[in-house]
Structure formats: C-alpha cells, structure tokens
C-alpha cells in the first residue's frame, strides 16, 4: 500500500514541480495553476486536474495555502538561480529559514525543494510529514547527515522517462529526510527553523552523489497527495554567501582531528567531561556559539588556553579555580605580586586548584610529580622574570609547535620539557582522561571546586591582554616587571573603551580598587550564588547571545586558519581577532561588561562602581530614559517597545530596562498560552472560558516591577488557538459549537483575561491590546476562509470580529487602546481590506487603532509603498502603531536606510502613532534570525541601523 502510494506521490511531485520552473513544460489544461513573484520570491500553486479545493495566497516571503479532496497539490516559494548557470558552491552558504504553521491531514510533507541541471537532478530536504514518511523504502541508502540540530537519512531514488525541467527524462532524486518528523498528522504544527542547504549538498557529494550540476532553485514546498491540509508560511527566506554553519557538529574540526591526531576518540568533549562535556558546559542553547566553535575552527582549546602561553594567555588564565582574585594577586599582601609569586607562596598547583581535596587523583598528578606550579612557571627559577624566563622567544608557539600549528602532542611536548613523565600528552591522550586520572572528578568538578563563577583569569587573560600589550612582546611585554599592574598602567583598556576606566590597578593593587571584594565576591555579590562559569557565560541560554565571538567576526576568519595562534599573535592584537579595525569598540560599542558577564545580574558589583564600564546599563529605567537609549531618544515622540520571551528577562534585564518602555510578550498571551483546557472542562459549563496567565507571569511581573507598559497580543487569531476551543465540552473530539456558544466563550475569554490581569498585576499598565490579529488574505480576497480559520468556520462572516471588539471595549481597563493588527499590510489590496474593517469598527465605537506589523525587507516594500499604506490607515482618524517592526537584509547599509525612513515617517506622524515596537531585541533571537533584521546583533551590539535611528532623534 505504501509502495504504490509513494510511486504516485513521486510522479505527482515531479510533474508538479517541473511546471513551477521556467522550463518548457506546460500544465494540463485541466490543471489549476498560479505563478508569480512577490518581493523577489518566486511562487507557484499547482493543483492537478483542478480536483477538489485548493488555494494559495502569496505575500513577500510568506504565503498561506490549503487543500482538500485533491489528487496532487503543491504550493511553494523560493529563489530561482537558473539564469546564473552556476554550481551551488559558487553561491557560498545557502540557508533557508522558515516559520510555518503546518496542518497535514493525510499524505503530505513540508520540505526544501529544487533542481540542478547538467546533470539533471531533483532534490528534497524533508522537515515534516503527515501520515507517511517519504520516500518510503525506495532507492539507495546513502548514509546520514547532521545539520541544524537534526539528523537526516540520505537516499537516492530514480525517475525513468518522467516529466522534468527539460521534458521527459530519466534523472535521480536526492533526499535528506529527518529521522524524526517535525510535524504530526491531524494537528497544527508550529515549525520554525533554519536549514543549511549547502551542508546537505556537501553531504550528498561526500556520499558519492553527483552534485556537479548548476543550481536551478531553492524553495520551501508544501505538498499533498490525496489528502487535506493547510499551511501558514509566516516567513520563508533564502540567503546565500558567507561560510557554512557547522551546526555545532564541528565536522572535521574537533579537538582530535585538528590538533591532536593521537587522541583518536578522546576529543575535548570526552577529555574533561564524562556526562557534562565541554559542549554542554559552554553551549547552553547558544547554537553556533559554543566553546568548541569558538576554540576550534582550526584553533583548538589548547590554542585558546595557551595562547597566553603563546604570547599572552596561558594555563594560569585557564586554571584559577579555587583561589580568589584577591589571594591570587595579593599572596601575603604583595602589591607588586607577579605571576611568579602568584603560583608560589607555598600554594602550589595541588593546593591552589584542589584545596587539598583531590589528593592524587587529578590535576595533582598532571601538574605535579614534585614539579609544582611555581616550577612550571619558573623553569629557570627566574622569580622576578616569570614569563620572560619561560617564554624566552616571546612565543610559546616557537617552543611547542611545528609549522605554526599548536600541536603540543607531536613535537616538543610541553610536559616532556617540563613535567618529567607526566606530560600534557599523557593527560590529553589517556583515552578518557577522566577515567584514567580523574575517576569521577570531571572537568566541571575541577572548575567548580568552590568557585561558583569560575574565574576571572579564564576570561580576562584571554580577552584583553593583546589590546594592551601589542607588538610581539606578549607576556614579556606584559610581565617585564613581573607585575600585573604594569599591564594596565600605560596601556589601559580606557584607551580602547573611551572613558570606561579599565585601570583596576590605579594604586598597583587590585585590593585598593576592590577593597576586600574578591573575585568570588565580585561575581556573586548576592546575585550569582550558585551560578558557575557555565551559567555566567550562558545566563539566558541565549542563541548566539552574550559573548558571541563567532558572530563578532570570529577569529579564524580573520586570523589564518593555517597559522593557528601564531597567525593571530603575529600582530599581537586581540582587537584584530575580535574586531575589524583593531578596535574593540567597533565590535562591542555599547555592550558593557555587565551585559556580557552578568546580563543584568551584577548591578551592585564593585566592578560596576569602580570602573564605570556599566555606565549605561545600571537601572536606567526611568520613564523618559537617558539620551543614549531608544526610549530616551524618542520619548517626545512615542513609546519604544520590543517583543520578549521569558528566558531573556534575566540575561537581558538591564538592556530591556534601558531601551524600552513597552513590551509585547512574544507568545505568552496568545490563546494557546492562556486557555486552560482542564479548567474549562471542569468549570466552564461548555461556555465559560477559563484563563491561566502562568506562562506570561514572568513577563508580566517584570513589566509591573519595572514600570514598563504592556502591549497585549492577542485574543482572536486563526493561528495558535487550539482546535478544542471551538468544540463541544472543550474536547478535541467534540463537534464544533454553535455561534451562540462561541459568543459566550469569546466574551468570557476576553472578560476573564482582563480580570486576571487586573487582580494579579494591579500596577501593570496595559496600554493597548491586539483584539484581532491577521484576519485577511494578502490578495484582497477578504477574510481568511473556513479552511484556514475556525472562527470563520463557526461564524461564516465577520460577526466574530465585531463581537470581539465589543467585548474588549466592555471589559478592557481604562486607558487600554484596542487594535486591529495585521501583516503584509502594505500590499495595496490587503491595505484596503484592513481599512474597510477598521472603518466599520470605528463607526461602532469599538476600535482605537490599526497595528501595522511591518515585517519588511530591504528589497520590498520600499519606503514609498509603506508610506502609502500608513497614510491610508492614518486617514481613518484612528491611532496607528508599528507593532512588529523588523527589516531583513543582506546589506546592513540598506537596512539602515530603510530603518531610518520608517522611523522618520513615524516621527512625522507621531501625533497619531503612540508606539513603535521592534519585534525582538537582537538578531539571534529573532524569528528571522538568518537575515539579521533588528537594530542589535548578538550580545546586544548596536548595528548601523541603530546609529541611524538614534541620529534622527538628536
């Protein structure tokens, strides 16, 4: 049964999709077909023989579609590359990003789809399906590929004498199919992801599949065969250029392969970790920004940690665990205490790292054998020349590398020179170091022996020294007088950070600046408590958030892949590694220390108080805001808002409080988040909708406590509203209810939500609410149909919209403005539909404003098109809010231009525009993250668009 089905599916797919191309193939006269281009994206809908019902409504990088009782159906949108006649490799890294609500009911799948020519080939990257997984058991198994957090099975199937781009032909099909579907049958699946298309192409080539042809297209495809279903493709983007995303896989670039070929399967992850590997430790949801990525890419962790041993950064930095900063710098109140003294004072490596707790089962063995840390640092007993004595050639690389490659384990082993028989190679090559030398004492334990925030050295001496000690003198230059203080006297961080006084050691004594506030205290201040280094780096489980070196022009790209740290250190400049113009400020701009390390949780730290680094980030939450904040700059025009998810409220707290006086919960007030099915069934009597604000609680409390106004989003929406809400007894299997019952449910949902907000958050300013969201099709066809909206299915007309606004007007708190919100609102036909509904509601006295979501791109719409829609909405006499602004781009200058124009329009019409909301805080958390659509990049780094927008308000 399945085999016959797949043959029909494949046949239908081929004939369908070749019609979508610019090939000399003509659809059957009986076929239903629409094709076109919107905003630079090609689209097509095809319904074989015109059977059943099928529709597609395209927008700029988005579309909706539905099908029922069809033979074969597809709807697709993407980019066509045929005119360029190039192999896929010529385009760099091709990435497709999608945000889709996909509802398959039977045989259907959602995939990335396309062709190559010369030779002819058709391909699929399948993300989800309904009741059958393509391509069944047909074809040859070609292995697997792991990409973007998923594992895909690779198959090759053949089509013989079938329709194709080039007429009837015989050609292969290549498949990557997720081992676990991203969707389930007979339900709405909220699918959001990024597909590294190039990585699949590379994997196919590596598996022996011919990828020599010219790329024809890359599209997102929704397909159905003898089934029903629908999809709301909220966004699809195809970008190319740049380097391929390793997806956290590291491919051939892991510790073993790059720098330690003798370790076999004992890579860095296994080496110090057991069940808490290095990836886990540093990759708390950071996607591509784990330490492996950062410390790998032809520059392994050894290089990273011993870069200081290569000129400025050594194991001293890396291994400070249980000895606080004060002690470290002031062993016995020695103000000029240098690195030599640091490791001495009877505080050898055993004592220093293990507090007498590890005995003979760990680093004690590794770094000791009667060769304590002092000896390691002072091979020649140069107590006053520390690193100079150790680094006679100003370069650890010269001592421990061949061909400028940090391969400790091949020649001149560090331990062979310095450690008797217990060399570093042994430590790295014990085939699971933990098992042989650590037993159950893994790296996390070693790093967290009483620490909480694993140490300053680890960051500081890996980040800053090159900036201050340039020109091939590394540790010698830094440590000429054996004094940490000297490092900061003449080459202060201040020089790189304007007025942010980095000079910890003004009095040549850390204690003078920090008093008795040691590093542990500094990191914990009652704020961090049990937050260890893992948490410190990943406070918010950010995706590429925080210290996103890889997104800050990661050093491998700037600093020769073949030249390891020598390549980086030849110029002895951290700036070169972390920034383009040897200026940390170029990359960090306003990204303060507190933001990076503490994400708003170190407010009262001495560091903040002593060094002013966090000048712009400390509780800047007055209503007007400072002039260097968005809300401050635009305070005389309108509120500045953003959308947030709860996970960002801790890590980004200071950033949010500084820049925004309005917050929209990204998902937590949508119907699926607030409707309580269990309570509805127990207490609802089939009509009284029960509400829970538990998922929104953290966001609501944050707004209330910090005086930030709330934009509610949303009550009535065809999407993210559970099907059971429309059925008898609030049951998934019940019949759909009548209009009368639905009216009662709608009224009680709105009434109970406002009541809960008032009772649970009495001081919260709910200043506006999206009552209805995304009602209309993109083509001027009016409201969505019953096949795409349960509201329309039950009501059959727009009466539910009128009722929703009526109930909201009745129950909303005083001062809360009621909005009709929609996207692609600048498409002229849709502009008219929104305008007409708004005027209808205005005549009834139920509406206050129109929400323009404003999901834009630099290539569509232009500012004039947008202004036309804005003026149409303003002509209603209602308020207009820009509610979800983002602008995708491939060119930051073009993005800055359009942001400037949109803000200028808003400022010119601020009498009717009370708020502008940016849909997200930083690119890495955006739903369109692959196209960098926001004002801030990873780590809350201001972009050119931010600068242009801020300049408008001056």
From Swiss-Prot:
Its EC number is 3.2.1.8. Residues 624-952 form the GH10 domain. The keyword Hydrolase applies. It catalyses: Endohydrolysis of (1->4)-beta-D-xylosidic linkages in xylans. One of its GO terms (molecular function) is endo-1,4-beta-xylanase activity. Keywords: Carbohydrate metabolism, Glycosidase, Hydrolase, Multifunctional enzyme, Polysaccharide degradation, Repeat, Signal, Xylan degradation. Pathway: Glycan degradation; xylan degradation. Residues 233-628 are annotated as: Disordered. It is an enzyme of class 3 (hydrolase). SMART domains: Glyco_10. Residues 233-243 have a biased composition (Polar residues). Residues 246-622 have a biased composition (Low complexity). The keyword Signal applies. It comes from the Bacteria. Xylanase domain releases more xylo-oligosaccharides and GH10 domain more xylose. In the N-terminal section; belongs to the glycosyl hydrolase 11 (cellulase G) family. In the C-terminal section; belongs to the glycosyl hydrolase 10 (cellulase F) family. This is Bifunctional endo-1,4-beta-xylanase XylA. It comes from Ruminococcus flavefaciens. The lineage of its organism: Bacteria, Bacillati, Bacillota, Clostridia, Eubacteriales.
